[in-house]
């Protein structure tokens, strides 16, 4: 089995590193494509031994399982580009927030009947094999496709199948969750520094506290509220600290953050379904394509428009 990534950003890097670290895939069995071969993640993938290409079609031809690891607004462009290259063997896995299975199936069905599509939502801790992933299978995906997906993604953390209509909520919770945790850790470390701790030690202690708390919860059958109560002695330091968090609306802020992420995911879904893309997104997509498709005698001007090079500067031997 070979795996391809359309997109060579943080998610592709995290999954590729997780798969190779888990031993489920050798690096030479992975290929990723990106129009920008100067990305830091591209360099990191290359050092791992992953094959890199600027051409999406090459990645499709190399792959059995194809991950669409690009921003939601790019998906319609990608499907139009690679649709004709999708074959019966391909399992197309979308990692794009808000992009529905039906919208992908509709696009691909214009090129080939019964495309095998899976939608997943994962997160970047897959890079250390502690990811949280859910997936939903499409109309034409086979039972074995779901099993293969679970085998792959269980190697890099927790993975389970859900109904597709739950994936937006998962995006708000665990998809965006690492960012909430990093923000909390940054603030905890600032608190430690304010009270006199060296920065490095403060970050390490905060991270270990959250890691330990998460493991305690996962290894017990107790409600998180009960575990919180177990730490809070009457009149002690912890209950006073919790009072400050409650006064600041800590719980409500987290609930609202999950809700905001979920709502934005649904907005992205609506935009993708209607193929509505912001002007800035269109400009970036076009510029990326121009970089790949420009003939040798053209160059990008500072404004982002293509301009013809003077004949004296064009490569020799081309009229």
Swiss-Prot record:
Protein name as annotated: Pyrroline-5-carboxylate reductase 1, mitochondrial
Keyword hit for Phosphoprotein: yes
Activity-regulation annotation: Subject to competitive inhibition by the reaction product proline. Subject to competitive inhibition by stearoyl coenzyme A.
Domain of life: Eukaryota
Residues at which NADPH binds: 8, 10-11, 34, 36, 56, 70-71, 97, 230
Reported disease: Cutis laxa, autosomal recessive, 2B: A disorder characterized by an excessive congenital skin wrinkling, a large fontanelle with delayed closure, a typical facial appearance with downslanting palpebral fissures, a general connective tissue weakness, and varying degrees of growth and developmental delay and neurological abnormalities. Patients do not manifest metabolic abnormalities. Cutis laxa, autosomal recessive, 3B: A disorder characterized by an aged appearance with distinctive facial features, sparse hair, ophthalmologic abnormalities, intrauterine growth retardation, and cutis laxa.
Positions carrying N-acetylserine: 2
Residue list for modification Phosphoserine: 278, 301
Region (Disordered): 294-319
Organism: Homo sapiens (Human)
């Amino acid at each position: 089995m070979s795996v391809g990534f359309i997109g060579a950003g943080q998610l592709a890097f995290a999954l590729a590193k997780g798969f190779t670290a888990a031993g489920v895939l050798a690096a030479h069995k992975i290929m990723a494509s990106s129009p920008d071969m100067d990305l830091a993640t591209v360099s990191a993938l290359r050092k791992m031994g992953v094959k890199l290409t600027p051409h999406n079609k090459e990645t499709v031809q190399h792959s059995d399982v194809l991950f669409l690891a690009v921003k939601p607004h790019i998906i319609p462009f990608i499907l139009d580009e690679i649709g004709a290259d999708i074959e019966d063997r391909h399992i197309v896995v979308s990692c794009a927030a808000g992009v529905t299975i039906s919208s992908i199936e509709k696009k691909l069905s214009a090129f080939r009947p019964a495309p095998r599509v899976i939608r997943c939502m994962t997160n970047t801790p897959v890079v250390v094999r502690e990811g949280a992933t859910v997936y939903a299978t499409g109309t034409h995906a086979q039972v074995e496709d779901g099993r293969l997906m679970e085998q792959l993604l269980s190697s890099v953390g927790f993975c389970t199948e859900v109904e597709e209509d739950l994936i937006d909520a998962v995006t708000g919770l665990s998809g965006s969750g690492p960012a909430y945790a990093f923000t909390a850790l940054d603030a905890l470390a600032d608190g430690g520094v304010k009270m006199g701790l060296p920065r490095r030690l403060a970050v390490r202690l905060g991270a270990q506290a959250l890691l330990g708390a998460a493991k305690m919860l996962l290894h017990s059958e107790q409600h998180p509220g009960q575990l919180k109560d177990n730490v809070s002695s009457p009149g002690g330091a912890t209950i006073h600290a919790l009072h400050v968090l409650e006064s600041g609306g800590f719980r409500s802020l987290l609930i609202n953050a999950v809700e905001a992420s979920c709502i934005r995911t649904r907005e992205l879904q609506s935009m993708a379904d209607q193929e509505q893309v912001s002007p800035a997104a269109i400009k970036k997509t076009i510029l990326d394509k121009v970089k790949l498709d420009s003939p040798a005698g053209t160059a990008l001007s500072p404004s982002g428009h293509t301009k013809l090079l003077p004949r004296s500067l064009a490569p020799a031997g081309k009229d």
